[in-house]
Swiss-Prot record:
Keywords: Glycogen biosynthesis, Glycosyltransferase, Transferase
Pathway involvement of the protein, from the record: Glycan biosynthesis; glycogen biosynthesis
Organism: Mannheimia succiniciproducens (strain KCTC 0769BP / MBEL55E)
Protein family membership: Belongs to the glycosyltransferase 1 family. Bacterial/plant glycogen synthase subfamily.
UniProt cross-references to Pfam families, sorted A to Z: Glyco_transf_5, Glycos_transf_1
Keyword Transferase part of the UniProt annotation: yes
Protein name: Glycogen synthase
First and last residue of the signal peptide: none
GO molecular function: alpha-1,4-glucan glucosyltransferase (ADP-glucose donor) activity; alpha-1,4-glucan glucosyltransferase (UDP-glucose donor) activity
Amino acid sequence: MKVLHVCSELYPLLKTGGLADVLGALPAAQKEIGLDARILIPAYPAISAGIPDTGVVAEFHNSAAGHVVLRYGEFNGVGVYLIDAPNLYAREGNPYHDQWYNDYADNYKRFALLGWVGAELATGLDPWWMAEVVHAHDWHAGLTSAYLAYKGRPAKSVFTIHNLAYQGLFAYHHLFEIGLPTSMFNVNGLEFYGQISYLKAGLYYSDAVTAVSPTYAREITTPEFAYGFEGLLSTLHSQGKLVGILNGVDDNIWNPNTDGYIQDHYKLKSMTGKKKNKAALQAHFNLPEKPDALLFVMITRLTEQKGVDLLIQSAENIIKQGGQLALLGSGAPSLESALLGLAHKHPKNIAVKIGYDEPLSHLMVAGGDVILVPSRFEPCGLTQLYGLKYGTLPLVRQTGGLADTVVDSTAENIKERRATGFVFNEANSQALSHAISRAFSLWKKQRTWFTVRTVAMEQDFSWQISARRYEELYRRI
């Protein structure tokens, strides 16, 4: 089965979030189980630099982009089509906005071309390979399904929601420029409150829609999580067209026994390396090297969605019980300054690095005792999965993929060898603080802690499992 993934990020070449991690791993896992999976992505500078050896598949003229060349190369064993359109894509840095965080004014053209080429690869743009399933990811690729529908559905279409908060909204008058008829601009189509929504195109015109966890798939049928799409998503859910499939963990990148970013490897039967990573992490952050101090880590975008404000309000509980907190991330200036203020006030307990640092993130997952993911909503979440794999117990809010992947350390769950971390329900600082206290209580019972840690490390969230679930879906539609 020939599967084309249409996307705008690819780990490790270009990443702004978890979307890149998925595309860096899922197509390769699908190839391993026998699917012929390929990727379509704009030829951003970082992508072109990472895939330098390409051949020309097709050339054409586009009114928005001018001369366009469709190239083909390979990356990590997976075939990749690159849309070489310098007028639209030859921009360094973030693929969606400029250095001042202003969205590019021509994003409607940039991502319409991505969707159009995705549909054309199902109808012969590459005469040697024709997609049977076109799998689009997030709003950037949402128009793919609309173009396929306009062409009479020459291939099956699947659309994955990684984050419903970003909807790809553009003015109605751009409809003519993107080559779609006015008949598609209505409630049963592209229209969303008077604008074109590329996200809605993906939701409405696809044969199946997936969310990146079963719980998130249910949550987005409710007004609290649906951003105005609850009617459409509820309909899709009742028709069996909306399903949740968990993301996986790329074992080539995230594995404590082979991790290329850490010096001291370890595995379930030999955990000495974890203690060494903890000491190295404490040294890196200039925290006192205390093996007995409970060390919390958090790697995140600094936004209220991620519950960072809840942590700021609860940090006192970590300090008062003699714990330590190491945090890596960037985002809202108010949250950055509040965290830096805490670190300045409590240098023996709290350390903060503003920015993103891939090697450091691996050391933090390897060296921490608890990884914090107190999100208000979380479609899937990846850091809690890394924590499980590295024996760094996740402390999470019961939402989205966090609810599907972490089992709370209640007495009953511990006894049944099911517990893998700490879970709290309400999105407030009191609930988070109580969960932090429960982590300290368990830390005092080291034998029980080791039992929970063992169960956590035994969990299997490999991409092969996810790849098989997607294959089942492709064959069903």
